[in-house]
Amino acid sequence: MNNIRTIKGGVNLKGKIKVPGDKSISHRALIIGSIAEGETTIEGFLYSEDPLSTADCLRKLGVNIPEIKKDKPFTISGLGINGLKEPKEILNCGNSGTTMRLLMGLLAGQEGKNFILTGDISLNERPMGRVGKPLSLMGGKIFGREKGNKAPISINGNKLKGCVMGTPVASAQVKSAILLAGLKASGTTSVIEPASSRDHTERMLKAFGADITIRGEFGRNVVIKSGGSLIGQKILIPGDISSASFWMIAASIVPNSEVLIQNVGLNPTRTGILNIMNSMGCNYEILDKSTIAGEPIGSIKVKTSNNLKSFIIEGDILPKLIDEIPILTVAACFCNGVSEIKDAQELRVKETDRLKVMARQLQKFGAEITEKEDGLIINGQSKFHSAEVDSETDHRVAMSLAIASLLAKGTSKIMRADAASVSYPTFWEELAKLTN
């Protein structure tokens, strides 16, 4: 990653766009389609590095996935829950934590088969014990560096037993891994979270015919019963609200802007950013609401707002906007008053330490940000000057810095800007279109 982008401040954003397909749903459509019976057709797939890593690993497990082409639907021939093959080579998950953690759950119960998962330098330093430990309690045989916490990860497929599992943090990846393992475990597997996390896995498993029940306060208890089979489906993947968030915030804070973002997923476990935009006093409306394959979608129209209010992010809302914290940090710099992000320790083990990286890079523009162990304190009403900043290889940091550059006086440079392609390959083209 050595690509440099130059961005001129003082321009506005006008126009309408469609953002790429939802990354979370793209991963899950591939994985669940692979273990369903019959064919699954996927439209709106996110053609980017992370979901393509998932596709590559599944091919090595014997799944017939054709070459995926940008903006083209494709069809998977599923192997059924018991049909995955033992691979002849190591499964490389690239930079994708979702790929590695969900595959750990998928493969733990594949009796008598052995698997090795690895990733790039960054992924191999991210914590995997949070998935490995609950799977081990179900009978999984999972090994890795640093007592199973770091990849490369070795999995000896074993007979799993259903159980009731409480997770220490609200994590969709941990929950999803346990639910996928539950498909192969004896009896019933129940996951109880401290707060509700993204529920794309539950919605999709249900659409494919799994015996899954969601109960408890705010849907924090998910129960799956093994023994059934999944049936292939037609999946239309909505636009990713995490990718849309860059334009939603940009149109709110860049003067004289108006942007319409079409066909965005509005799953209530993902719309925390709308709650924060409400408290900021942002000027937006949701149009053309509908539901496709159990996922609510709509278009979001955003206009510039004056006198935005500062905000606090803490507690149960975190899982609903965890990926939007970098761009909300940029927004906070232009609100009135002091904003605070708390309870966000999880960001320290993302692709980078996002708290540290966002503070370090935005300070180069002149932002006043104090880093805390679990978050950030951000002084508003900043006057940004141009700067040379660095994504530090993190896709969400790269795109957040691009939006920050629009509010800086003069011309800024973003180093390693090609990191954006991990989740949004056309980001720079869309930025040029909206600012032209």
UniProtKB/Swiss-Prot annotation:
The keyword Transferase applies. SUPFAM superfamilies: EPT/RTPC-like. Pathway: Metabolic intermediate biosynthesis; chorismate biosynthesis; chorismate from D-erythrose 4-phosphate and phosphoenolpyruvate: step 6/7. It is found in: Cytoplasm. GO terms for cellular component: cytoplasm. InterPro entries: Enolpyruvate_Tfrase_dom, Enolpyruvate_Tfrase_sf, EPSP_synthase, EPSP_synthase_CS, RNA3'P_cycl/enolpyr_Trfase_a/b. It comes from the Bacteria. Keywords: Amino-acid biosynthesis, Aromatic amino acid biosynthesis, Cytoplasm, Transferase. Signal peptide: none annotated. Phosphoenolpyruvate binds at K23, G97, R126, Q173, R354, R396. It catalyses: 3-phosphoshikimate + phosphoenolpyruvate = 5-O-(1-carboxyvinyl)-3-phosphoshikimate + phosphate. Belongs to the EPSP synthase family. This is 3-phosphoshikimate 1-carboxyvinyltransferase. It comes from Prochlorococcus marinus (strain MIT 9301).
